[in-house]
Design a protein with these regions (language model features):
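N-terminal pre-P-loop "Q-motif" helix
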Residues: 11-23
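Conserved lysine of the Walker
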Residues: 43
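Interdomain motor-coupling "hinge/lid" segment immediately C-terminal to the ATP-binding subdomain
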Residues: 149-247
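Sensor-1/coupling segment of RecA-like P-loop NTPase cores
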Residues: 33-34, 117, 128-157
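Accessory nucleic acid-recognition modules appended to NTPase machines
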Residues: 204, 210, 217-368
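Conserved NTP-binding/hydrolysis module of P-loop NTPases
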Residues: 55-59, 64-85, 98
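Conserved P-loop NTPase "ATPase switch" module shared by AAA+ and STAND
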Residues: 100-121, 125, 145
Length: 439
């Protein structure tokens, strides 16, 4: 139901086959496995689903004192342990795990909560992994803070650097998975515009209802009384330790059309060098993407465009934030127009996702939506233009002629004479005959 009270749809578990196989392989090897990904991407459901199928111990960490954290973990798993002695600290807890007679799998979800309370825990774990972890046992540490997980496991000076047999990143799911999970017709433009509002985050999909259009979905998720998404950007930034007004202000500027660092700085009334650190932090947190023209290196090119990665967060800053005060006064046609414009940017991303190594290219007043190695000609390029509408044959031919003419005027054309051209439109959203969802 809409108007402030919303039903949360129970979704099918879909499209995590690759992650399931990685978890199976990790269980066979034993050791340490790191699972990370932004909040609400589906890490916990994936891990619980996998452990329901194969068995194991699972506990989600609390944000509380160390004694309470250890007590909660022990309470969650004590029925599966061969002891009833309660641990008084981390050393006791790790010793209990080491004394178990049978191989085990233990997942500690929201691991950064534990290290935030006890910064010595990674060093304790390092010693235990090196000397006390029994053969055939698997410890899974999962977390939502991309920056903190990077600092804990990928920084060369971190105690746990190099200790994991695998780092498994759980990413957003794609359009096909969205259609499967929500039981929607994939070729329809209306379905893709719903996807553009929620992106690949399964938690947001729970607000999708059959028979409701993209405007209904946007109002339920963003514009109704106390909407679910109202504080979402702040929650994500808080997870990443990005406090203060500057990260939000940067995202506001990008959402409203500032794509270059100089443009963002101008919107914020500051100099570009003052934003270098926060721009890098937002990239590290997988909130912003930094795009270079196709074929150029980050070490030599100064031409950069920034974009908000997640479609739902992009919608927040490009549609919700600028229009929330007046949204209720807009006629349905204007609301649909705003959503359509946002969906066009997501469709452009979707087109590039069809080709490995695809990117954008731009110079002066020329821009191409897609440039990549041509899968049909290893020595050539595929150059594409995306249009978020169903083009007629005449419209398609007109866009194709304009694309070829634009290519002939760009510097990249002289270095790549073998180019093939393609125009993408809404007709390209087709059902891929996917496998049935896991019940």
């Amino acid at each position: 139901m809409f108007n402030g009270i919303h039903s949360h749809v129970k979704l099918a578990f879909v499209n995590r086959e690759a992650e399931m196989l990685e978890l199976d392989a990790a269980a066979r090897l034993g050791g340490l496995l790191i699972v990370f990904g932004r909040r609400r991407v589906g890490k916990t459901r994936l891990l619980r689903r996998w452990m329901d199928n194969r068995g194991g111990m699972f506990s989600q960490a609390l944000e509380g004192p160390v004694e309470m954290q250890i007590g909660q973990i022990f309470a969650d798993i004590r029925e599966q342990l061969e002891t009833r002695i309660e641990p008084r600290g981390w050393e006791d807890f790790l010793e209990i795990l080491g004394l178990q007679k049978k191989p085990w799998v233990l997942c500690l979800d929201e691991f950064p909560y534990l290290t935030a309370r006890d910064p010595s825990l990674p060093s304790r774990l390092q010693r235990w992994l090196d000397h006390g972890l029994p053969d055939g046992c698997l410890l899974i540490l999962s977390g939502s803070s991309m920056r903190m997980m990077h600092d804990l496991f990928l920084h060369r000076t971190a105690p746990l650097y190099g200790r994991a047999q695998k780092l498994l990143q759980v990413g957003p799911m794609d359009y096909r998975a969205f259609c499967l999970a929500c039981d929607l017709e994939s070729p329809a433009e209306s379905t893709f515009e719903k996807f553009a509002c929620v992106g690949g985050i399964p938690k947001y999909w729970e607000f999708v209802e059959k028979g409701k259009d993209a405007v209904d979905l946007a109002e339920a998720l963003f514009f109704d009384f106390a909407p679910y998404m109202e504080q979402e950007p702040r929650r994500i930034l808080s997870d990443e330790g990005l406090a203060g007004v500057t990260p939000l202000a940067v995202l506001e500027a990008v959402g409203r059309g500032a794509a270059r660092a100089s443009e963002i700085a101008a919107r914020l009334g500051t100099v570009q060098t003052n934003l270098s650190r926060v721009l890098q932090q937002l990239q590290d947190a997988s909130v912003l993407s930094r795009d270079l023209p196709y074929g150029e290196s980050s070490r030599t090119s100064k031409r950069t465009l920034y974009q908000i990665l997640d479609p739902a967060i992009r919608f927040w800053f490009s549609v919700y934030s600028p229009h929330r005060s007046l949204w209720r006064t807009y006629p349905p046609a204007k609301k649909s127009h705003l959503i359509h414009g946002h969906a066009a940017t997501v469709f452009e991303d979707w087109c590039r996702s069809l080709y490995p190594a695809a990117g954008r290219y731009w110079e002066k007043d020329i821009e191409f939506d897609l440039v990549c190695p041509d899968p049909e000609n290893p020595s050539g390029l595929l150059v594409g233009e995306s249009k978020w509408k169903r083009l007629t044959k005449a419209e398609h031919e007109r866009v194709l002629r304009a694309l070829k003419d634009k290519w002939s005027r760009c510097a990249l054309a002289s270095r790549h004479p073998n180019a093939r051209f393609r125009v993408f439109d809404a007709n390209d959203i087709k059902s891929p005959f996917p496998p049935s969802p896991i019940p």
